[in-house]
Amino acid sequence: MELFYWCLLCLLLPLTSRTQKLPTRDEELFQMQIRDKEFFHDSSVIPDGAEVSSYLFRDTPRRYFFMVEEDNTPLSVTVTPCDAPLEWKLSLQELHEGSSADGSGDPELLDQQKQQMTDVEGTELFSYKGNDVEYFLSSSSPSGLYQLELLSTEKDTHFKVYATTTPESDQPYPELPYDPRVDVTSFGRTTVTLAWKPSPTASILKQPIEYCVVINKEHNFKSLCAAETKMNADDAFMVAPKPGLDFNPFDFAHFGFPTDNLGKDRSLLAKPSPKVGRHVYWRPKVDIQKICIGNKNIFTVSDLKPDTQYYFDVFMVNTNTNMSTAYVGAFVRTKEEAKQKTVELKDGRVTDVFVKRKGKKFLRFAPVSSHQKVTFFIHSCMDAVQVQVRRDGRLLLSQNVEGIRQFQLRGKPKGKYLIRLKGNRKGASKLKILATTRPSKHAFPSLPEDTRIKAFDKLRTCSSVTVAWLGTQERRKFCIYRKEVDGNYSEDQKRREQNQCLGPDTRKKSEKVLCKYFHSQNLQKAVTTETIRDLQPGKSYLLDVYVVGHGGHSVKYQSKIVKTRKVC
């Protein structure tokens, strides 16, 4: 098998070539080998101009080899750790006189050179230990057999290697701008806005670049593959093959596939991954997320948690080569949740409260005098609102309130009441709240169970309509208003205007029909009727009835649309 790979290496060394100094690149053969990832995974040969991904078992070194045929050859080698720190070194074993380019086509001589380098320690050119993306670059390298040795002492890990003899023309990694930092331009409780300088690879060289943003709570990442390794830590990709199977321990094609698939055509196991350049939203893990945003260099991250430290990394990906470069990441702590201001309620005084959609509001009621009972009148002007009442930390009440509700609680000397209001998902809410220890004097106007306005169809004329509504046993003032509306006025439009807290003072004087007092001790007879005159034939009108209580506080009945007859 080893001889077979060295034969493949020989195919990359045509004697007539004088430009490439690593295995000379036959483009057609090179592209074929790029597609066949198994060639790289199984081979210890580094091809010229292609990124190799492979795996390291802990404390088990891995060696790669490549040949440089001529002196004064440019050479660049880049190693990218994808998880654990690596120890790696690059060594050179000079060629013997009998192993010149004239004899480079003989696989036996190449095999001898490799064996000599294994047996005899060569000249160390470069070494590094850490988890940074590090590279060796030489504008003039001697001919010889080069060995790259990698070791992971912490844990099993994987990495990437890229080598080329044409570093100036290849440029597969996107170039960083003169200022490679990611800037936090603004941040709040749940959002952070990031900005960075565009890559010259996109702005000057006009190569396709995509930016990917990685957000996590632990630390910044130095490479995109390190971030993706963290995201995929639970995937089968990291599961080592089971012992006893016929596999090369460094053959990545088997990793992550069940045993019953190992006998299938290996070409099915080596399908190329999708281009990173597409708009891919990775399935987020617990504390890390990657979002690719195209060629924009400003991005706002939302839905963050308040008072939490986040780390932000930006990677630019060359969508032609699928290779990436990291900006210098940033971190910031989001702002604390704004402390809720508590509204003080005065005994017997109506307080207007506005609650944002899904928002919260806190109110406090501390009666000055001793009391036996406390009454809360809560008027939800539109949609339902969740109400909680606590006294000295103890929960007394928790209900959804729609319309007008009255709650009477047993009092306690020097008791302090905390009211929490929580808005719903539909939209913002407006309420009127009255807390009192003397409910008989400061009650909201009482309402019947049915607050609809009924129109009598048989009593309709071209200029009038007759309507009726229910009252209560308490003598109250009722005011009725009318407003002409379009014939296609819908129920949805009517609901949008159904703010029960808007009183008669918000209506035009021309819309007022009349006001009258009404009550009945017999609830069965607590019905009043009214005929509204001076209307136009065939027109639609919106009718509203308001009941006014002590202190001028009013409540609106459900609106009613009526239509006069067109022909009489």
UniProtKB/Swiss-Prot annotation:
Residues 1-19 form the signal peptide. It is found in: Secreted. Its main location: secreted. O-glycosylated; contains heparan sulfate and chondroitin sulfate. This is Protein NDNF. It comes from Mus musculus. Residues 261-331, 445-564 form the Fibronectin type-III domain. One of its GO terms (cellular component) is extracellular matrix. Binds heparin and chondroitin sulfate. Gene3D superfamilies: Immunoglobulins. Disulfide bonds: none annotated. One of its GO terms (molecular function) is glycosaminoglycan binding. The keyword Signal applies. Keywords: Glycoprotein, Neurogenesis, Repeat, Secreted, Signal. Expressed in brain and spinal cord with no expression detected in heart, kidney or liver. Expressed by neurons but not by astrocytes. In the brain, detected in the cerebrum, cerebellum and olfactory bulbs. In the cerebral cortex, highly expressed in Cajal-Retzius cells. Also expressed in hippocampal neurons and in Purkinje and granule cells of the cerebellum (at protein level). Expressed in neurons along the GnRH migratory route. Pfam families: NDNF, NDNF_C, NDNF_N.
